């Protein structure tokens, strides 16, 4: 047997025990802890299987029926399924399922619709926006003239009057509605009105809340926007990747911007996993999971607004949530964001530190937390479980917390909802 054929048939554990051991350790971590990073989720086993198939071997530059390589008849079927399912799920006229990530999807939209130096208007990163919406250190802030709108200091909500005033002043070519850390629904009708008043195109980045949209629990931006981008993980719960939805008249530009504009060969194994995830997202089981996601976030926000939490300097930004995440302001707490993240990690809950508007601390420290419920809802958590998690978090962020007791409560919840049994 040749060395080549040996490597072709060996298992991961046989061929590379170091990587296999790290993968096993990560599976154990996911099983034994509570994942509450708002952008993370657990992909269905069928999604994992699709992504681990022989499709990883296939190059397929181009689009279904128009490839630059032979032997694409089967990947054409899969990619067309993904396209059709995305269009049906969100009511879109056009879908491109090839972007490798949400950032790549946003890049492709800019490449398709804008020229270097054009003006864009997006939510300030420090107020909950995203790097790709015009941050100065990101390509979007280097190549484009980025103007930022903000949330109001009084209530933490987007100031739509400011959005309108800035749009009239700067005449952006593209207005971006979307966020990475904002706990309320967006007023897409108002954004559309402002775009129409100023002759701008409207892009909605729904990466965080796409799953809620699919389940009918959040307004659908597709009827309002010229282009919608999203990731396929987060609340959608699929593989890590991107997706673009657009009006039909923009479809050719979008496709050309993705390939050959920004990418070469698409990742057909990931596109297959996207197709599977989009099928799941059209099911009642998925909608029920999203209802628990939303309910869990509201339960968490309610617990963290109780008097004992307030006395510990804990404040919920905007006073609550309409989505899958809660933003916690710790400016008046004994903890900064990094310390709070570490404390929760110590007891087995994974979250991420997050800047709050006008944060006095540096980005690697911050004064806040972003806490999400999608992964736990996928794991099967219901209202009673979320109430227990919320109380554990509240107790952990207060002075004099009992790490051992709280860790035991976390372990009990993890054991109650086993993850990937038999994997």
Curated annotation (Swiss-Prot):
Its EC number is 2.1.2.1. Belongs to the SHMT family. Pathway: One-carbon metabolism; tetrahydrofolate interconversion; Amino-acid biosynthesis; glycine biosynthesis; glycine from L-serine: step 1/1. Its main location: cytoplasm. Its cofactor is pyridoxal 5'-phosphate. (6S)-5,6,7,8-tetrahydrofolate binds at residues 125, 129-131, 249. It is found in: Cytoplasm. The modification N6-(pyridoxal phosphate)lysine is found at residue 234. Keywords: Amino-acid biosynthesis, Cytoplasm, One-carbon metabolism, Pyridoxal phosphate, Transferase. This is Serine hydroxymethyltransferase. The keyword Ribonucleoprotein does not apply. The lineage of its organism: Bacteria, Bacillati, Actinomycetota, Actinomycetes, Streptosporangiales. Catalyzes the reversible interconversion of serine and glycine with tetrahydrofolate (THF) serving as the one-carbon carrier. This reaction serves as the major source of one-carbon groups required for the biosynthesis of purines, thymidylate, methionine, and other important biomolecules. Also exhibits THF-independent aldolase activity toward beta-hydroxyamino acids, producing glycine and aldehydes, via a retro-aldol mechanism. InterPro entries: PyrdxlP-dep_Trfase, PyrdxlP-dep_Trfase_major, PyrdxlP-dep_Trfase_small, Ser_HO-MeTrfase, Ser_HO-MeTrfase-like, Ser_HO-MeTrfase_PLP_BS, SHMT-like_dom. The record marks 233 as: Plays an important role in substrate specificity. GO terms for biological process: glycine biosynthetic process from serine; tetrahydrofolate interconversion. Coiled coil: none annotated. It is an enzyme of class 2 (transferase). Pfam families: SHMT. The keyword Manganese does not apply. GO terms for cellular component: cytosol. PANTHER family: SERINE HYDROXYMETHYLTRANSFERASE, SERINE HYDROXYMETHYLTRANSFERASE 1. Signal peptide: none annotated.
